[in-house]
Amino acid sequence: MSKLFVGSEIGQLRRVILHRPERALSHLTPTNCHNLLFDDVLSVEKALHEHDQFVATLRQQDVEVLLLQDLLEETLAHPEAKQWLLRHQISHYRFGPTFANQIRAFLLEKNNKELASILLGGLAFIELPFKAPSMLQQLSDPFDFVIDPLPNHLFTRDTSCWIYGGVSINPMAKAARKRESNHLRAIYKWHPLFSNQSFPRYFGDENRHYDNATIEGGDVLIIGKGNVLVGISERTTPQGIENLAKQLFRTEQAKQVIAIKLPENRSCMHLDTVMTHMDHNVFSVYPRVIDKNMPCWSITPCGDQQLAIQEKPNFEHSLMQALELDSLNIITTGGDSYEAEREQWHDANNVLTIKPGVVVAYERNVYTNEKYDKAGITVLPIMGDELGRGRGGARCMSCPIERDGI
């Protein structure tokens, strides 16, 4: 049996979870897209074609691709998993007691494929075949959603992240994404691929309100050698990082967490939108945000499950020290000032490394890809004119569950 383990950002990628969000994207409109954290509506047909190409590119590199909807459908075959998900998704507090019971009964009549599609892609009031004694139903527009679509499930990196020998099921920052975590909780507990293996769940797998302790996988880079690099961003808080660090140290899966502060704006919502690891000493960086002389924080274990937190004056030096390197090769976003800003917006720095020196990147970022090529990095180009409008690149759209260390 293959081992669930992610030991780096650059070691051979072996297995990964992706999501092809057809139903959810078809429910995006100009009216609701901003509430669902998209800047615009996407062409569904083109986006799915681009995603299929992404899947094919990974499989051509001998990466096993698991699709989230398939995993959820297979998880729902377990009766306890189905009951647990519906109890958490369709609560009396969200819908009122009578209406919630009738929605659950309606959904239990669906086969597992249909139910997975609804949970991921949404359900409108007009699709309900019954009228409940419910003020909520009576006051709602027929085309309002009973169950909101989850188009951001496209970005499987964020909802859970495998860090060395375990997983963090992340408490998400935005209301539009919070339901995503329950799908991964169910999959990791009941799907036979995971239920037959033992691994620590660092964070996010309890029935509790995590308050301000949010964390998203786009901010988490497993840089190797027992180190984890995390961005403090609009989505990931210091409280989230410290709670994650405590569990990493308790389970002896990591020896240091390095944290850096990012601006809180949409263009760099996660660390991996401005920085990714491409080869042993090679990083892609957007220089307007990531500077080698910026401060960072080193978090290490300190007896009796306490944390030692020390501010460091030089990020580059801390990174080299963690990776046991004498120097770093920093490749900055390509083009002039205007071109670099445009390409960063379209995820030029958000690449998925397949193995050292080989990355998947959007083909549209020609200036940055040219710099990668000149630096000896092999770029496997994929289309991203539609997918990129969701504000995520190849790394954002992938959740590695098996990758070699360095």
From Swiss-Prot:
UniProt keywords, alphabetically: Arginine metabolism, Cytoplasm, Hydrolase
Metabolic or biological pathway, per its Swiss-Prot or TrEMBL entry: Amino-acid degradation; L-arginine degradation via ADI pathway; carbamoyl phosphate from L-arginine: step 1/2
Family as reported in the entry's similarity comment: Belongs to the arginine deiminase family.
GO biological process, one term: arginine catabolic process to ornithine
Record-given protein name: Arginine deiminase
Native species: Aliivibrio salmonicida (strain LFI1238) (Vibrio salmonicida (strain LFI1238))
Catalytic reaction annotation: L-arginine + H2O = L-citrulline + NH4(+)
Cytoplasm is among the record's keywords: yes
